[in-house]
Amino acid sequence: MARDPSTTPGSPDGHDAGGGTGAAARVVQADDERADEYAAVLGSMAAVHPDDRALVEEWADARTGTVVDAGCGPGHWTAHLAGRGIEVIGLDPVARFVAIARAAAPQVDVRRATVESTGLPDAGVGGVLSWYSLVHHEPDAVPIALAEFRRVLVPGGGLLVGCFTGPVLEPFEHAVTTAYRWPVNRLAAVLEAAGFRVDAVHRRTDEGVRPHAALVARRS
């Protein structure tokens, strides 16, 4: 889900957009149980750090064609981008998040789908925003989502990935369920192996919150 990561360590700031069985299904269930809490605390643009807002806006404004908010959660980013005149589709596997997003912005296209199976056509979108929507994915599962992102993107289409970062790839206890910190160079290597070119990396560390990074990439 697209979210503001610059929150206190105990807040429910990570939402995974996977589905299916096993670990992914447990994440979806946990998110569904806390969807209203998340939406009330973090489900608005007022909760977004100004630096993150500027980065995502600049990236999205530069896309040609539809932008997919992959793991849109309560849909605040989806609605915000639509309000800027961008053609955007919000996707989330959590039924309650989809309902909240549709109620908040009925004019915006929000669909229930996972990041591994978006239901979108091949090479049909200009950008994919994955703003903290992979943070609960087990590392071996991340390439599956990236393959789906690459499939739906036009050649040269943009991908923006937000993540928790640290010196080593490691799990940590999160308010929803286990999440992962990624070294930037390691996640960049995974993106490149999945058929993306990483063009830029943005890092931000604020006192009292988890370090995070954003990787700007494009389908190669």
PLM region spans:
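Conserved class I S-adenosyl-L-methionine
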Residues: 2-63, 167
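Class I SAM-dependent methyltransferase SAM/SAH-binding core
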Residues: 68, 74-117
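A short acidic, Gly/Pro-enriched loop at the edge of an enzyme's catalytic core
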Residues: 116-128
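A short SAM/SAH-binding and catalytic strip from SAM-dependent methyltransferases
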Residues: 127-141
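A short glycine-rich, Lys/Arg-flanked "PGG" loop and its adjoining helix->strand segment in the class I
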Residues: 143-155
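Conserved beta-strand signature within the Rossmann-like core of class I S-adenosyl-L-methionine
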Residues: 156-163
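Acceptor-substrate binding/catalytic loop of class I
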Residues: 170-186
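Core SAM-dependent methyltransferase catalytic element
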Residues: 206-220
